[in-house]
């Protein structure tokens, strides 16, 4: 009976590869196939569409690189039955497209193709070329000129740029295309890329081979049937964990978790990075701003013990331009591990497919919002049967420990790991917090970045798919604020979840500082701040003056209105009084009807005197009122 190693020898592959490809594989140091390669290469090299789901680090990239090169070699070099060589590929035509969700992964895939193509014999005549098509590197016009000049048979890139490229000129023809590959297919078929990917596939001939590859392809669901595959064969390769349970992670990868107070996360991370034995590590942060924030802190605040092996930090995130990202990734990959321990601080931009040698350790400061990404992050280590370690930090005193059971349902098993509790770790935390506060006080811009990172994390947390576990109502807002180095809590709706008994006065997390005197280190920025501060003060004074004037104006209008109302009341009273007197006189006349005329004349005269007195009194009142009006 053959051993497993013997059965996976390349000579036992159930498909006859071109001799130059066999030589390339041998020269590159791959004595045996991986299970996914042994299953996939014969199918895809033949006439089968495939959907491949295999654990991270299982050799999926070579599983499609070899079939693509095999098919192109057949098209370019394989004689027909009469011994005649095939016709050259027409100008403007391509034979294969490989799609990737990120620029970094596309760049890496091209590197693998080019490594194999180094072994293509010179006497083959027509060379097999590749071209990288990703955003932020050159423009589509430059891509088109390069394509028409070099005539590459293989296009590798991100969906947006490839779709733009295919529609940029009538000189580009897809009718000769033979095979298309979707690497990290579950990501390419989610809402962020699906439209572009489907539009690309519509431009390609229906009689083609299609390969979908991912560690979590099952999450793509029924979307895979929109890719135009014909009776695809599903290749699924899983491993068993140390307990013999079926697992979606490689056996060589040790997965563990820590329950930790968020305030202690950063100093615990630094302790692990200083004390653990590894060559290269990748640390995943939730947002781009948090990567920038902690990258600055680690380089300016953290001081290692002289006995520890020196650390070198690298920053990689989506807000960097493509050239900077590729340069950082190259520096991290090519760095001398004999001089430093290399630590890449990154986001999910480096979570999928990227194969970096010597990565022994992966740490996640927080779990990803999408549980499927968890395995992709961890899979940057423990690749190709090499031992790797992955740790995820979960916030204590809330429901996050339920995440472990949630991941077990998905076939991912984690063991609990204790946090470092030595006196040295406690001293590190105390000293680090003092230095972190001083670092923040030196430059207002640093605190603004810290606040931006904190707010970004809260938004990130609120978008978690497992919302029943990651709940805003149970989050330790104060502990996280201290972790990010905040001096004061920002005003945001989520602070309503903080219990009033622990809510700091006016949001201050330490000694109160005068924000008007809290300055920027940058002189130009500080000058602008002071000018804005002065303008704000003037505006406040002007606003107060306007409010006072408006108040006086409103009061004057109110008094005038009141006087008018009083005058009308007096007139009404006088009218009623006059009517009452007239009524009384008429009543007396009626009773004394027939009396002597002298009495009547006397009554009339008395009435006239009364009217004159009333008029004089009214005139006097008006005169007095007028004098008050002049005041």
From Swiss-Prot:
It is found in: Nucleus, Nucleolus. Residues 265-429 form the Helicase C-terminal domain. A motif (Q motif) lies at residues 10-38. One of its GO terms (cellular component) is nucleoplasm. Its main location: nucleus. ATP binds at residues 54-61. SUPFAM superfamilies: P-loop containing nucleoside triphosphate hydrolases. A motif (DEAD box) lies at residues 183-186. GO terms for biological process: assembly of large subunit precursor of preribosome; maturation of LSU-rRNA. Residues 583-631 are annotated as: Disordered. Residues 41-235 form the Helicase ATP-binding domain. InterPro entries: CTT_SPB4 (IPR056330), DEAD/DEAH_box_helicase_dom (IPR011545), Helicase_ATP-bd (IPR014001), Helicase_C-like (IPR001650), P-loop_NTPase (IPR027417), RNA-helicase_DEAD-box_CS (IPR000629), RNA_helicase_DEAD_Q_motif (IPR014014), SPB4-like_CTE (IPR025313). Transmembrane segments: none annotated. Keywords: ATP-binding, Coiled coil, Helicase, Hydrolase, Nucleotide-binding, Nucleus, Ribosome biogenesis, RNA-binding, rRNA processing. ATP-binding RNA helicase involved in the biogenesis of 60S ribosomal subunits. Binds 90S pre-ribosomal particles and dissociates from pre-60S ribosomal particles after processing of 27SB pre-rRNA. Required for the normal formation of 18S rRNA through the processing of pre-rRNAs at sites A0, A1 and A2, and the normal formation of 25S and 5.8S rRNAs through the processing of pre-rRNAs at sites C1 and C2. This is ATP-dependent rRNA helicase SPB4.
């Amino acid at each position: 009976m053959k051993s497993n190693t013997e059965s996976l020898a390349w000579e036992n592959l159930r498909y006859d590869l071109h001799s130059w490809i066999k030589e390339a594989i041998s020269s590159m140091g791959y004595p045996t196939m991986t299970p996914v390669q042994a299953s996939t290469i014969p199918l895809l090299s033949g006439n089968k569409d495939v959907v491949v789901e295999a654990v991270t680090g299982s050799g999926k990239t070579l599983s499609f690189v070899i079939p693509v090169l095999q098919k192109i070699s057949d098209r370019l070099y394989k004689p027909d039955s009469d011994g005649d060589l095939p016709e050259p590929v027409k100008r403007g035509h391509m034979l294969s497209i490989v799609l990737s969700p990120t620029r970094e992964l596309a760049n890496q895939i091209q590197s693998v193709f080019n490594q194999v193509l180094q072994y293509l014999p010179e006497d083959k005549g027509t060379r097999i070329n590749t071209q990288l098509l990703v955003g932020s590197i050159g423009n589509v016009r430059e891509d088109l000129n390069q394509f028409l000049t070099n005539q590459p048979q293989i296009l590798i890139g991100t969906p947006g740029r490839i779709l733009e490229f295919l529609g940029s000129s009538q000189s580009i023809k897809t009718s000769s295309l033979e095979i298309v590959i979707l690497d990290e297919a579950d990501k390419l078929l989610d809402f962020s890329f699906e439209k572009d990917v489907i539009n690309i596939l519509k431009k390609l001939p229906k009689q083609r081979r299609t390969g979908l590859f991912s560690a979590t392809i099952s999450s793509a669901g029924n979307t895979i049937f929109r890719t135009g595959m014909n009776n695809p064969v599903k290749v699924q390769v899983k491993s068993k964990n140390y307990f013999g349970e079926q697992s979606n992670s490689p056996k060589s990868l040790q997965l563990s978790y820590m329950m930790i107070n968020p305030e202690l996360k950063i100093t615990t991370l630094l302790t692990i990075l200083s004390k653990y034995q590894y060559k290269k590590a990748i640390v995943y942060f939730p947002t781009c701003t948090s990567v920038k924030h902690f990258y600055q802190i680690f380089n300016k605040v953290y001081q290692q013990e002289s006995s520890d092996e020196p650390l070198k930090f690298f920053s990689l995130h989506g807000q960097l331009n493509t050239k900077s990202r590729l340069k950082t990734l190259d520096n991290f990959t090519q760095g001398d591990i004999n001089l430093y321990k290399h630590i890449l601080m990154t986001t999910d931009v480096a979570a999928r497919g990227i194969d970096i040698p010597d990565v022994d350790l992966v740490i996640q400061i927080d779990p990803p919002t999408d549980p499927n990404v968890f395995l992709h992050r961890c899979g940057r280590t423990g690749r190709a049967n090499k031992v790797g370690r992955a740790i995820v930090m979960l916030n204590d005193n809330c429901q996050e420990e339920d995440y472990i059971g949630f991941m077990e349902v998905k076939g991912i098993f984690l063991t609990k790991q204790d946090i470092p509790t030595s006196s040295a770790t406690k001293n590190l935390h105390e000293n680090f917090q003092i230095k972190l506060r001083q670092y923040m006080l030196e430059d207002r811009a640093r605190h603004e970045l810290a606040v931006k990172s904190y707010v970004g994390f809260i938004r990130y947390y609120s978008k978690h798919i497992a919302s029943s576990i990651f709940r805003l109502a149970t989050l330790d807002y104060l502990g996280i604020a201290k972790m990010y180095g905040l001096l004061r809590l920002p005003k945001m709706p989520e602070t309503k979840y903080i219990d009033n008994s622990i809510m700091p006065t006016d949001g201050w997390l330490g000694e109160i500082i005068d924000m008007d005197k809290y300055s920027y280190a940058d002189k130009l920025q500080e000058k602008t701040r002071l000018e804005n501060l002065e303008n704000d003060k003037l505006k406040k004074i002007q606003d107060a003056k306007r409010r006072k004037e408006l108040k006086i104006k409103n009061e004057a209008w109110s008094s005038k209105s009141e006087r008018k109302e009083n005058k009308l009341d007096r007139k009404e009273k006088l009218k009623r009084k006059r009517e009452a007197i007239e009524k009384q006189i008429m009543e007396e006349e009626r009773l004394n009807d027939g009396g002597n005329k002298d009495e009547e004349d006397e009554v009339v005269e008395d009435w006239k005197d009364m009217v004159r007195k009333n008029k004089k009194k009214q005139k006097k009142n008006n005169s007095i009122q007028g004098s008050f009006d002049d005041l």
